[in-house]
């Protein structure tokens, strides 16, 4: 119960010949096992470490109930990019840093569980968007820029994302 479930990866002899994602993600069984490590703390220190305040014990409890769509809905209330943030967010310096389980062993793999939920949910989100005909530019196509662009688009703005690192911008309709 105390041992963190490690994520499977592609064999190095295979991955050095392609550009596939190295980490394979959790299986259902692995996710349930890792989720069972969550202590569901009342003070929720992990949430305090999350920049977007995801209800981490809430979504993990839904994984324990095998209700992936509801776990996704909980995450989506705070984050529009769970598939991205579950992969690239530095959880070890944020939510996982404050996980009580980490005092005596490794913290719960919160980011890996978020990725699992994003990769395995079957629900779709539909927004009723009323265009306001106001154009907005967002500078930077990292997680913060894309989250900002998504939120603005949902609010009806015509958003153009610009990236300065060798890209010409994502000037399509967001």
Where are these regions (language model features)?
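Ferredoxin-type iron-sulfur electron-transfer modules and their immediate structural context
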Residues: 1-135
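Gly/Ser/Thr-rich helix-start
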Residues: 59, 143, 170-173
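Functionally constrained cores in energy, signaling, and assembly domains
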Residues: 62-64, 137, 150, 164-168
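Conserved SAM/SAH-binding loop-helix junction
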Residues: 94, 147, 170
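Short acidic, glycine/serine/threonine-rich loops at helix termini
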Residues: 110, 150, 171-174
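N-terminal Rossmann-like FAD-binding beta1-loop-alpha1 element of flavoenzymes
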Residues: 134-160
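Glycine-rich FAD pyrophosphate-binding loop
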Residues: 157-171
């Amino acid at each position: 119960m105390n041992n963190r479930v490690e994520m499977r990866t592609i064999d190095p002899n295979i991955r050095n010949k392609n550009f596939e994602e190295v980490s394979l993600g959790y299986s259902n069984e692995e996710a349930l096992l890792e989720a069972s490590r969550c202590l569901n703390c009342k003070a929720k220190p992990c949430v305090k470490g999350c920049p977007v305040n995801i209800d981490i014990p809430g979504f993990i409890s839904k994984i324990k109930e095998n209700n992936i769509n509801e776990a996704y809905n909980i995450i989506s209330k705070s984050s529009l990019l769970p598939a991205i943030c579950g992969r690239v967010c530095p959880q070890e310096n944020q939510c996982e840093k404050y996980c009580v389980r980490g005092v005596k062993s490794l913290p719960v793999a919160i980011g890996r569980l978020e990725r699992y939920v994003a990769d395995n949910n079957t629900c779709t989100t539909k927004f009723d968007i009323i265009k306001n005909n106001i154009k907005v530019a967002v500078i930077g196509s990292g997680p913060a820029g894309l989250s900002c662009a998504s939120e603005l688009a949902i609010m009806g703005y015509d958003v153009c994302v610009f990236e300065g690192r060798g890209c010409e911008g994502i000037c399509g309709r967001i």
